[in-house]
Design a protein with these regions (language model features):
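Start-transfer (signal-anchor) and selected internal transmembrane alpha helices
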Residues: 1-33, 112, 167-170, 213-220
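Perimembrane helix-loop-helix junctions
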Residues: 4, 190-226, 241
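Loop-to-helix entry region of an early transmembrane alpha helix in multi-pass inner-membrane enzymes
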Residues: 74, 78, 86-105
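Transmembrane-helix signature of polytopic, membrane-embedded enzymes
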Residues: 98-129, 146-147, 163-168
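Membrane-interface transmembrane helices that cradle and orient dolichyl/undecaprenyl
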Residues: 112-118, 152-172, 203-205
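Short acidic/glycine- and proline-prone juxtamembrane loop motifs at membrane-interface regions
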Residues: 137-145
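Membrane-lumen/periplasm interface segments of specific transmembrane helices
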Residues: 214-257
Length: 268
């Protein structure tokens, strides 16, 4: 019996390694064409060059929003700053690899909630096929938002399907929401929809104590990521410009005549 158990554990370990390598191979195929790839010497596209320029400015003591204009979230510039510390201009590719790998991993994990391993690997391949051309641009805010979305989707679905929940999971879910808010807030629909579903369920079943528990630990996770970024902006006198560029500017930009209004506003 002991030998059988050891054999099963060994088989599971081998299977886990094989799946990890498979996901790594899929990730590599997805982003090897990225302009910031260490194997690619093609021209970096406009958005990515802006992010890396701001990261370079940060290395010189400048601040996004205050000294350099852009309307993306501060986490994106921090990611590029860390990438440049790893390897000048190319180091962000390693972070990109981790982000895409986590996305693939949680696509697999989410599919595994209701499918066998083979079907889950097929799901990863299908998703990778759909995203293949998209990742060619490289170093986009959506790339870094997707692992946060994948993690949160897994946590929400595991809760609704299997009732698996814990303080850690709630904080991780809040952390992922904070990450997307600090990258690209128009991608937060998943948290809005599923959080409303949880709230409605708790109210309907009169589980208000559970609801307060969920909200508390979700908010803790959210502010673990968001608060340090906001403090960093405040301390460096960039918070007012952050509100102007990231919130006000994007609200105008998202309207029907946003492009014209934005240009007029910037040149008033």
């Amino acid at each position: 019996m002991t030998d059988l158990l050891k054999r099963r554990m060994s088989d599971q370990r081998i299977m886990g390694i094989a799946i990890a390598l498979f996901l790594g191979a899929v990730t590599f195929v997805l982003i090897v064409r990225s302009p910031i790839s260490i194997w690619n010497n093609s021209e970096i596209l406009t958005d990515s060059s802006v992010f890396e320029y701001i990261a370079f400015g940060m290395q010189q003591g400048e601040m996004p929003y205050r000294d350099m204009f852009d309307h993306k979230g501060p986490l994106l510039y921090v990611i590029n700053y860390i990438g440049m510390l790893i390897q000048y201009y190319k180091g962000v590719w390693y972070i990109e690899f981790i982000a895409v790998y986590l996305t693939c991993f949680f696509v697999y994990k989410t599919a595994r909630l209701n499918c066998n391993r083979l079907a889950c690997l097929g799901t990863v391949i299908i998703c990778a096929t759909l995203l293949y051309n998209y990742y060619e641009a490289g170093n986009l805010s959506e790339e870094y938002a997707m692992p946060f979305i994948g993690i949160a989707l897994y946590i929400f679905l595991d809760y609704f399907l299997n009732r698996n929940i814990s303080k850690i999971r709630l904080m991780v879910c809040g952390f992922t929401a904070g990450g997307v808010c600090m990258l690209r807030p128009n991608m937060t629909a998943l948290w809005i929809v599923f959080s409303l579903a949880v709230i409605l369920e708790c109210v309907q079943k009169k589980k208000l104590r559970d609801l307060s528990f969920f909200i508390l630990y979700f908010c803790i996770g959210f502010f673990v990521l968001v608060l340090p970024l906001l403090i960093w902006l405040v301390v460096n006198n960039s918070f007012t410009q952050f509100i102007d560029c990231y919130i006000d500017f994007n609200m105008i930009y998202s309207t029907g005549n946003g492009g014209k209004e934005v240009m007029l506003r910037r040149w008033e």
